[in-house]
Structure formats: structure tokens, C-alpha cells
């Protein structure tokens, strides 16, 4: 599974000891594999001398989080004081998706401006149909809209990512919200929730279905699909143009 690092991340050797001479840099496109028997995630990342593999105890640092952007305005008619924190999950979902697909670290301000210019900023959120259309033009991507879990699963296993349109059924949000399906680690779907905050998944229902590892979520694909029921489309399947 590929994912963008959004912060400097400390790493360990395969035995779990800290490796003070190595680190993952913000902007690195990384390949993360399922946990080892030692409970560590292998991460392969670029260096000046080629790729290197080290290990991390959790998936912290791999998320563009809208909660960090309370000072970045994202106005819409009727929501003139809105910010990326209050209404920009779609913006940060797009940053997470583009980073994982292309290795391009897109500044949130740049993605915010893109959403506004293309008319994707609407009262209450982001028009993802319009924004993904612009992402395809700007970053050389392709997008297929889908309502089928089987198509989502096949797409992720072939190396794509998906922006997922949750319906506020209480698992990932109590209101409409965008999250990103990054791929699978073992049999679990790895999800980037741009609205993640401390304690969000600590309720009994969420805790039973979703495991938080650092800044990313691990869950069953069916759990995500159930939370998207009622949305059309449920999934924006994004991939690079061959």
C-alpha cells in the first residue's frame, strides 16, 4: 500500500530498536506492508542513495488532517467564515489521495484554491464530482464513480485509491464526510480520515469496528461500505492514467 508522509517520522530497525540515523521525511511516498510478527509495519521510502526499508510501530504521520487548518479560510455562500477545518474534509481527502497516487505533496492551500476555482466549494462542503474532474485534469489522473464494494476492492488491489462519500451513519462521521481508502494491509482496509481527532473512535460502536494506528484507520471493507449507503456515488475510484 502506498501512502504519503506528511511529517517527519522516526523509524526503527527490524528488531524494534530506534534508528536515530534514519527517518522518513515529509513528502516521501512510502510503501507500507502488513505488520510483522514483532508488531511493526515495514515501510519502504526513498533516500538519496535509493529506497530503504525501516519499521514503524504505528502509522503516525501519514495523514493530511483538516483539523490543522482552522486558520485557512474556505468560504461558501452562507458560510463566509468557514475554514478548511470546519468544512474542508474534501480538500484534505484530495490531498491524501493525490499524494498516495502520484507522490506529489500538494499544499492544502493549493488544493483549497483549486476547489474554489473549479466551483467545487458549495454550501456545506465540497462537490467531489467537480473536484475529482479537476484533479484528473491537473494531476493526470482518471476517475470512475462506483457504488459497488467489489469494484472498490478490485481497484484498491490494483494500486488505486478511492475518495469515499460517507453518509453520516455514525461510524466515520455523524454528518456527510469524505475519507480515503488507501489500500489493504493484510485483510484490513486502511483508511485516511481527514477529520481524525483524539478519541473520535473511542465509542463502543466505533471501537468494535475500527482500529486506530497512529493517524490511519484499519477496518473491514464492509464497515466502510455500510457507512456509505445512501450516497451516490459512494466511491470516487482514482488512478493514474496508463
Residue map of PLM features:
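Beta-loop motif signature
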Residues: 2-48
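Active-site-adjacent structural segments surrounding the nucleophilic cysteine of cysteine proteases
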Residues: 3-4, 21-24, 58-121
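Short glycine/serine- and small hydrophobic-enriched flexible loop segments
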Residues: 28-31, 95-100, 137
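Boundary regions of SH3-family modules and the immediately adjacent low-complexity/disordered segments
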Residues: 44-61
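Catalytic cysteine-centered active-site loop
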Residues: 104-152
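Active-site-adjacent substructure of cysteine-protease-like catalytic cores
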Residues: 142-200
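Noncatalytic regulatory segments and standalone regulatory/sensor domains
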Residues: 184-242
